[in-house]
Amino acid sequence: MPVVRVLRRVACWMLQSPACGCRAPVLPSRFLGTSPRQIPMDANFHSTSFSEADQQRVLITGGLGQLGVGLASFLRKRFGKDNVILSDIRKPPEHVFLSGPFIYSDILDYKNLREIVVNNRITWLFHYSALLSAVGEANVSLARAVNITGLHNVLDVAAEHGLRLFVPSTIGAFGPTSPRNPTPDLCIQRPRTIYGVSKVHAELMGEYYYYRYGLDFRCLRYPGIISADSQPGGGTTDYAVQIFHEAVKNGRFECNLKPDTRLPMMYIDDCLRATLEVMEAPAESLSMRTYNISAMSFTPEELAQEVLKHVPELQVTYNVDPVRQAIADSWPMNFDDSNARKDWGWKHDFDLPELVTTMLNFHGSESRVAQAN
């Protein structure tokens, strides 16, 4: 027994000795398989150091949403096909399944998420699992579970395993009392949707984990994202995607927002590039953990006028959805993204004319292929 006591003292001395360069972290009790989920006061996690030249191992949660598939394709060009794992709780379409690694991942299942990170040696995690604004209002309890409880699981796994974590935020993180034109990075945030509330929660929790545990948390507040190869997913800005589908398909479009509703928008290529750029930015260049990013700002009427230059036969009508309109009226009209441009060199490529041309070219080509088939 004296030998055991001596060995125990030596082990404790080694763990706390300055010679080892760090103090061994005390893991949250949940990491040890116990309950309740409580983080001790002296816990201290620091992201595993790695050279930027090292090959990243990437996990994307909520990968079958509007942005996940495009992000996976974009990152695979940078890190290699097999180093970017797409995940979701739904069965992927065949083309997604064949394009690279795909696995089942339920962010509400902490053990499952932890096993994926460990078994695949994940270093970067992009957390896209969320219920969007309009869908969230229709199912608040589910939105609360996915957007908040799921986030807690992701934060804990990322902290435990020293990951670099990206969590997208949104224009929906602001509310009617926020300055709207422009909206700065730091101002009052009192959103009126469960989606917005959950995103403010994510921003603050990520920042807390950064300061408290050393988690390398990075976040961008996305404007409305417009993408050619995905269907609208229940967001308030979906009209700006749907108009292109309808213009090419049947020449008629009914908008559910007022014609003068101005919101910040961005083409998906700019969005994906900004996401990678902020993740690759040197830590010392980041003055904050959450940044606004923007590219353009327009109204449904301005978008329709630009589309009409290419599709003059398009008929646009307005049938305002009061729920979505109320949400849009509480959101920023313009984003101030000067900090992102100053700190890590953000610069957008697509303005409204380029956006419209690109979207119509894509859907026009898609329509011609369908007709040929």
Swiss-Prot record:
InterPro entries: Epimerase_deHydtase, NAD(P)-bd_dom_sf, NAD(P)_epim/dehydratase. It is found in: Mitochondrion. The keyword Lipid metabolism does not apply. Signal peptide: none annotated. It comes from the Eukaryota. PANTHER family: L-THREONINE 3-DEHYDROGENASE, L-THREONINE 3-DEHYDROGENASE, MITOCHONDRIAL. Homodimer. This is L-threonine 3-dehydrogenase, mitochondrial. The gene is TDH.
